[in-house]
């Protein structure tokens, strides 16, 4: 809200130097922008989420969801610096209170823990995180639901559970059809389970090519680690 207000106000002032008519159009948006600014200045929680002030208040008080958000930001910051998930201090994954399933940070925290565990090779705890995510499917946005289903294909493939891998795959066909390293890695694991070595190698190569487009060095390192394990299988 605050950023929107400042942008509209600045544009209105600048256009006034050149055109009164154009400036009038932008000045018309200032009251609504000011309303958003004031709305976000109050620590309220609405159906669409928390206002900026409510989030800030939670951070100051180290409330569960806000603490999880700050820790997630720290994790992604370190991923950008080149650390992989398992190389980041585990306190950012686990030094958190229990969150309710309908809290968005609940799913994000479990997703980060899953990646931490799977990179370390702790497949039991990784599977537990995925299963808990699947159990909270009703609260997940579609994109995250698809990603969870795709990672379930990966886990079931590693466990040689063809039936469950195929069931999970039916829930995320479009996601697995994407030209991403994650999708190719999951399909490669599925082919490895079926003994389709040549298809697995081809998909691994495609995944490695996709990684050239990955901007986050830590995620690139993570995917390379998982791909290397497929070669060992």
Report residues per predicted region.
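Hydrophobic transmembrane alpha-helices and their immediate loop junctions
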Residues: 1-233
């Amino acid at each position: 809200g605050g950023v929107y207000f400042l942008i509209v106000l600045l544009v209105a002032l600048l256009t006034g130097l050149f055109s009164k008519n154009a400036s009038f159009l932008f000045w018309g948006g200032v009251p609504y922008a000011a309303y958003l600014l004031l709305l976000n200045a109050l620590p309220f929680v609405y159906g669409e989420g928390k206002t900026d002030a409510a989030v800030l208040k939670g951070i100051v008080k180290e409330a569960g969801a806000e603490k999880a958000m700050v820790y997630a930001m720290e994790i992604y910051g370190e991923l950008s610096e080149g650390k992989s998930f398992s190389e980041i201090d585990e306190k950012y994954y686990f030094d958190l209170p229990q969150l309710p399933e309908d809290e968005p940070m609940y799913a994000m925290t479990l997703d980060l823990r899953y990646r931490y565990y799977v990179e370390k090779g702790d497949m039991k705890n990784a599977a537990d995180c995925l299963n808990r995510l699947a159990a909270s499917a009703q609260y997940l946005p579609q994109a995250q639901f698809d990603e969870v289903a795709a990672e379930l294909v990966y886990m079931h493939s590693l466990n040689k559970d063809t039936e469950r891998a195929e069931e999970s795959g039916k829930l995320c066909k479009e996601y697995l059809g994407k030209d991403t390293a994650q999708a190719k890695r999951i399909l490669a694991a599925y082919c490895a389970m079926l003994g389709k070595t040549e298809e697995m190698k081809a998909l691994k190569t495609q995944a490695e090519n996709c990684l050239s487009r990955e901007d986050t060095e830590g995620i690139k390192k993570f995917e390379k680690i998982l791909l290397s394990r497929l070669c060992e299988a």
